[in-house]
Amino acid sequence: MEKISSVDRVVGNISEAEKEQILRDKGERFDDQNFEDLSGKEREKTASELEIISLVNIATNELRQRYGLDDFDIPPENIHVISEESWPREKSTAFFNSMLQGVAMREKMSNTSFMKTLFHEMIHFKSYSAVQITTEDDSELIEYRVGLTVHTRDGKKIYFVNLNEAVTEEMTIRFAKNLLNHQLFSDEIAQTRSVMARYQGAVTDSEKPLFDEDTFYAEAMSKKTWRE
C-alpha cells in the first residue's frame, strides 16, 4: 500500500472502515498544509533551503531502505520555516507534528544548521507512526506511536520520549555528516574549522568543551561563539 502520510496504523475500538477513513484524512492533511495560524509567520524558503530539503529526503530515504522500507518523500510544503520574531518556543528550534503532518522550523542562520535540524525532524517524520482512538469515555484521536515514543491507550501518559530523541539525534549526527561534502556547506565548514581552531580551549558555562567531533557549525559573533 502506498504511503500517503506518516501514519502507518490506527489503533482503537472502531470499525475497519473508520480506521481507513482516518488514514485517508491524514493523507489529505499531508497534502494540504495551509494553516491560518501560520499566516504572516511563515516565510518563503530560499533556493538553498529547497535544495537541502531534497538532499535530506534522499539521505533519509536511504535510511529507510536499510530497514526494507519504501521511500517516503516529504514535500517542501510540509516544511514550515517560521520567522525568528514569530517563533513560539524559546528552547526548541524545530518540531514535527504528526497530527498536522508537518515540520515547523525556526529560521536558521546557516545552511549547515538548517540541514542538521531538518535531518533530525525528517527522521521523526519517516519513523513508524500510529494514531489511536483513546479508551476513555470521551475518546479522542491522538498519537499512539511516533518512533520509539508510546502514548498509553487512555492518552494520559507518554513513555520513551527522551530515548526517542536520543536515538534520533544519534542517527542524525552519524548520517547527516555524509552531506557535509556538498558544495552548499563548503564555506561554512571551512569557517567552522577556523573558529574551532581559534577557540579550541573554549568551554561552556558548565565548564565542558564547547566543541567536539560532532560539532556541525560554529560562528564567532563579536565576543561570543555560537555552535551547533
Sequence positions of predicted segments:
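Auxiliary, metal-adjacent structural segments of Zn-dependent hydrolase domains
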Residues: 26-103, 107-112, 132-139
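Short, charged/polar micro-motifs that form catalytic or ligand-binding hotspots
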Residues: 42-49, 108-117, 154-162, 182
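Non-Sec secretion/translocation targeting segments of pathogen effectors
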Residues: 1-7, 168
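Residue-level detector of alpha-helical secondary structure
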Residues: 8-11, 15, 19-27, 39, ...
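Short N-terminal edge-element motif at the start of the domain
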Residues: 103-110, 117-124, 128, 144-146
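Post-HExxH zinc-binding segment in Zn-dependent metallohydrolases
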Residues: 139-199
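Active-site recognition of the HExxH zinc-binding catalytic motif
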Residues: 116-133, 165, 169, 173
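Pan-zinc metallopeptidase signature
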Residues: 11-12, 25, 183-228
